[in-house]
Amino acid sequence: MDDMNSMVPAARLEHVRFSYDNGVTWVLDGIDLTIRSGERLCLVGPNGSGKSTLARLIAGLAAPDGGDMTLLGHHVFDGETASANPSEYRDARHGIGTVFQNPEDQIVTTIVEDDVAFGPENLGVARDDIGGRIDESLQSVDMAVSYTHLR
């Protein structure tokens, strides 16, 4: 990553609000949060405190009701107009991955490379090309190891 990209926060939320009932009850109210690239974050709190909702916003799976939100340098929600920017969300999502609360319900196998291969296999990618895609994908998240046995 170059110096310019390392200065762009992975996520920046300013005065973010979110409600499941059109503003009767605010699940998130006035959240200010900056997550720097490479930083790890743990959300801790009791059931119903908004952890999963906040994670869904940061993952680009939901839009806030208010505030400003930038994901990977893309201004996805504008508090002034209270509107989402679909093309910015789409661009940001290309760099965001999500593991849900019950990963055992979504992961195909306990072997990382097999799980990474699942998507390309189901998209009809030639078996000869999958090994390279696995390497590239794992390198992009700093998990680089050679999986030549899958080629």
Specify the residue positions occupied by each region the protein language model found.
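A short, flexible loop at the N-terminus of ABC-type nucleotide-binding domains that lies
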Residues: D2-A10, F18-G30, C42, E80-T81, ...
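ABC-type ATPase nucleotide-binding domains, specifically the catalytic core motifs of the NBD
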Residues: D21-N22, E80, A117-D128, S140-V141
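Helix-to-loop junction immediately C-terminal to a conserved catalytic motif
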Residues: A59
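Conserved ABC transporter NBD signature motif
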Residues: G67-E80, A92
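Short helical segment in ABC ATPase nucleotide-binding domains corresponding to the A-loop/adjacent helical element
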Residues: E104, T110-E121, G131, D135
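Conserved small/polar residues in nucleotide/adenosyl-binding loops
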Residues: T148-H149
